[in-house]
Structures are given as structure tokens and as C-alpha cells.
């Protein structure tokens, strides 16, 4: 951990898609440790000591709780959304976890992926995938075939349109109403969610569309500054200052 800090790393996501030596992941139903492993507990403590932010996106609920119980400083969830809008999707955060993270002083950064922000879109995506697999087999085509790509694009647009910027704003609203403006920020996951990003929020150049929607909902300039950078910088600063005081 100290080596990575020396190399410039300032946050580490504890797990990804599968349970690892550190702890259990949200996408993995194995529950190898029932949360953090003993090694994972040491990793979190060492991250605190050297000044690396603990990122709890991708971890299971129990791993999330275990890490919060150990961490002496605020944590982050670098690209997670609100589970209320996607019931049963453990990769997103429940209200209980959002409240626990806020009590810790942390910040969750909202993921913009369609399946993360809208359960209807997620269900539609599964149906589209099944149809496309069958259609490709029936027509003896590969996804790389230009005609197949055109068909998939047109079929998806017709049967499962992308979510909107307004739906992303709903996630910000929920967090703010639940725990306040100091605990939410921009996670995006632009490079991780494939072709599922909302209409009007396909890349960073479109952030003004989201900010305009939030302004319409009554957010202030100071609120947007907190969402844009102040909240995550506050956590980063707290982690660094704690580490500076360690032997």
C-alpha cells in the first residue's frame, strides 16, 4: 500500500467484479468472507495511515459496513448510484449505506450508467441483449458486422431508449434530501458503462446539461461547486491530513 502511495495513487477501490483477497464484491454471490477479510482490514488501516482514500464502490454491503467500522477517515464511493431506483441491485447504495457514509463524513459520486440509474432501462437492456443474441444466431452474423451494428443500434433505440439527464438528477435529489449536499458528487463512469449513458450526458462536455437541470430544481451555485469538486476535495484533504499525523 505504501508503495502505491509513493507512486502517486490516492484512492483504491477495494474490489471489482469478484471477491478478492481484500473482501467480498457486490457482483459476486459467493460471500467468501462475509465482508472484509482479515487482510482487507489491514489494507484499510494501512490506506488510512499512508493517505490513500478508501473507495467502496463495487464492494458488497457487508464489506462496506466493515470498512466503515475500521476507517478513521472519510471514505468515498467513486461511481455508485441510489439503490432506491434500482431495487435489488447491490452494486448501488441503499439508504442505510448512504446514511452510514454520510455519518463517516464521506461522499458518494453518482454513476451515470443507464442500468445504474433506472431499473426499467436495466430490464429493457436484458431483453434487448437476449433478442440480439437470438437475431445474430438466426442470421449467422457477428456483432462486428456493419449490418448487425446498424440493426442493434436501431432496435435498441426503438425498444429501450436511453434514460434522461432528469433521471440522473433524481439520484442527486435523493442523496441531498436524505443526508445533505455535502455527501454527493460526480462519478460518471463514462469509460465503464458502455453504450448506456443518458441522452444529453454522454461525456464531460455535457456536464452543463446536468448542472442546468439541478439549477432548475433549486440548487445554488455553491451547491454545484460542492457537487463538482468541493466535496471530494474535502475528503481527500481529510485523508491526507490524517496521514500526515501518523508515525
What are these regions (language model features)?
Residues 110-115, 179-201:
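Short acidic/histidine-rich active-site segments
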Residues 21-34, 197:
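Glycine-rich phosphate-binding "P-loop"
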Residues 8, 54-56, 79, 108, ...:
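Conserved, mostly hydrophobic/aromatic
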Residues 202-247:
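Mid-to-C-terminal alpha-helical segments outside catalytic/metal-binding sites
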Residues 148-166, 170-173, 221-236:
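C-terminal helical cap
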Residues 18-23, 59-65, 82-85, 115-118, ...:
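Active-site environment of divalent metal-dependent phosphoester hydrolases
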Residues 1-6, 28-76, 89-106, 167-182:
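Histidine/acidic residue-rich metal-binding segments in metalloenzymes
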Residues 94-150:
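Aromatic-lined glycan-binding groove of carbohydrate-active enzymes
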